[in-house]
């Protein structure tokens, strides 16, 4: 109705396109965002939303351009910066996979079969947590979680989370931790690896993360689902003497793991998982999403 009354109403075109996107009517949503931009050329949110749709349509180069335009008009646009960074890292990943294939051919090494890879059973190990690591995470920039579940974010409740570039932090303790975890990841998947995301969560009373996995359209487009994995490293499990002690719940098949301080769990990124926490003290974990290169 708003568009009928005012055809050049950019915000209305953006809002309608957002609804079409949620209904998975992606081509129509794309046209709607383009109309919004036509009537408001500096509309950062519309550029970002257009990039999201093009990402879903597997047109990553176009998405990249629109994330950059969103940042041009809104330099502090966190979501646009994150999505752009992911696409740039995906470009780097594809290059590394190709280089790895060439290297393996030169060495005449037979590719590891899927039967020898980490599959449905999680890989479990442990790493001693340094006190310095625990204290350093509180000093790194983080943001509050959404208070309610299903409000646009997987994580919810009382707590905080970092951005997705934790391993790029310059502190010696983070560098040492990332090196150790990368070696563990290589051991788990029997391959060199590429980290696409690294972050930390601090969960407090009445918090958690909804059922989800870590597959994205890029993985489907490049047939990388069987090469993507997720790691959780428990820095502090918090208060487990409560109704919801932070059990890691894995699905298909269902499995429950109650971690301890220092626990490391690695599983395929295709696998759905969730956790709920209601303890009195902070529950802190580092998360990593990564790919095997062969």
Language-model segment annotations:
Residues 11-22, 45-55, 79-86:
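Conserved alpha-helical positions within TPR/SEL1-like repeat arrays
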Residues 97-191:
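Non-heme Fe(II)/2-oxoglutarate
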Residues 190-277, 282-285, 289-293:
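Catalytic core of non-heme Fe(II) oxygenases with the double-stranded beta-helix
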